């Protein structure tokens, strides 16, 4: 018997710096409801989905910086999203900035959670591959200070049972790193999902700008194919505070084929019928890890 589900991606248009969380949650609720009306069992939302992409600014006021982080999840403003998910019977993946205090010390993470159809958090991931830089760089038209505002994740690349599927998460830059995909593939992930905020202009290497979409889709397609997993990527897209963000949110089959792709630079929902048993086609006949992998030759990957 095949295990079928409808997978959705909820792409976000720009979020202005002045836009409130309440306004953003209304938009997320609208996409959640649209996905459920199309029969979706699960929807993927973007990285840092509750605010504008604040690492593009250099903050000197710690209180102002803290205002972009969540200290509890769900908090009062975000709780309606969890309640609506439980009402409609649809799970979701949500990215946000997380602030925790341990031993009197503030710790900040770029975080993503998995929520099941009952509205319960069943998984958490903290972004490991942080891009960008740590200090202000005057030549840039916008900053990319993730290394300043977050520490690398400390949870590894876990895989969780979410309703009927085994799911793993990436956040933005993680999707470019094959090690992330392979760890989740080895752990049996059937769906690998996450969000991104990807500028179409990269100031250090502007000669790559025309390849931004190509590299994004290449990473998603190769990751899915080489690990025999479905994947889904949800972008925050369009012109956000004078920074153009990449579109092309997508759903990819274990064969590497794109089965759904957004066509706008605004809030948009895409869906695809997903047969989880198709993962076996790749894992049994092409990438049979137990039969073909030779890990004794891979040590350099972790040593350097």
Swiss-Prot record:
Domain of life per record: Bacteria
Role, per record: The enzyme catalyzes the hydrolysis of N-carbamoyl-D-amino acids to the corresponding which are useful intermediates in the preparation of beta-lactam antibiotics. Industrial production of beta-lactam antibiotics is now being developed using this enzyme.
The protein's name in its UniProt record: N-carbamoyl-D-amino acid hydrolase
InterPro entries membership: Aliph_Amidase/BUP, C-N_Hydrolase, C-N_Hydrolase_sf
This enzyme's EC code(s): 3.5.1.77
UniProt catalytic activity: an N-carbamoyl-D-amino acid + H2O + 2 H(+) = a D-alpha-amino acid + NH4(+) + CO2
Domain CN hydrolase: 5-276
UniProt cross-references to Gene3D superfamilies, sorted A to Z: Carbon-nitrogen hydrolase
GO molecular function terms noted in the UniProt entry: N-carbamoyl-D-amino acid hydrolase activity
Keywords: Hydrolase
Active site: 47, 127, 172
Signal peptide: none
């Amino acid at each position: 018997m095949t295990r079928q589900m409808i997978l959705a991606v909820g792409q976000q248009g720009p979020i202005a710096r002045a836009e409130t969380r309440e306004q953003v949650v209304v938009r997320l609720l609208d996409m959640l409801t649209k996905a459920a009306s199309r029969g979706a069992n699960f929807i993927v939302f973007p990285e840092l989905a509750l605010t504008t992409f604040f690492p593009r600014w250099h903050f000197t006021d710690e209180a102002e910086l803290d205002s972009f982080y969540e200290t509890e999840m769900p908090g009062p403003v975000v709780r309606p999203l969890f309640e609506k998910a439980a009402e409609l019977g649809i799970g979701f993946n949500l990215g946000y900035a997380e602030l925790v205090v341990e031993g009197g010390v503030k710790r900040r993470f770029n975080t993503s959670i998995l929520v099941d159809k009952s509205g319960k958090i069943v998984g958490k991931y903290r972004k490991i591959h942080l891009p960008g830089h740590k200090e202000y760089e005057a030549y840039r038209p916008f900053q990319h200070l993730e290394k300043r505002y977050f520490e690398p994740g400390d949870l590894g690349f876990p895989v969780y049972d979410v309703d009927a599927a085994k799911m793993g998460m990436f956040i933005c830059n993680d999707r470019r790193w094959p090690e992330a995909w392979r760890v989740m593939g080895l752990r049996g992930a059937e769906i690998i999902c996450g969000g991104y905020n990807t500028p179409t202009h990269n100031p250090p290497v502007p000669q790559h700008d025309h390849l931004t979409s190509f590299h994004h889709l290449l990473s998603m397609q190769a990751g899915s194919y080489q690990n025999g997993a479905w994947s889904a990527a949800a972008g925050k897209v369009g012109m956000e505070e004078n920074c153009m963000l990449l579109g092309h949110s997508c759903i990819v089959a274990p064969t590497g084929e794109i089965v759904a792709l957004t066509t706008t630079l605004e809030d948009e929902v895409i869906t695809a019928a997903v047969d989880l048993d198709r993962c076996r086609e790749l894992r049994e006949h092409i990438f049979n890890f137990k039969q073909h992998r030779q890990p004794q030759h891979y040590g350099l990957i972790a040593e350097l």
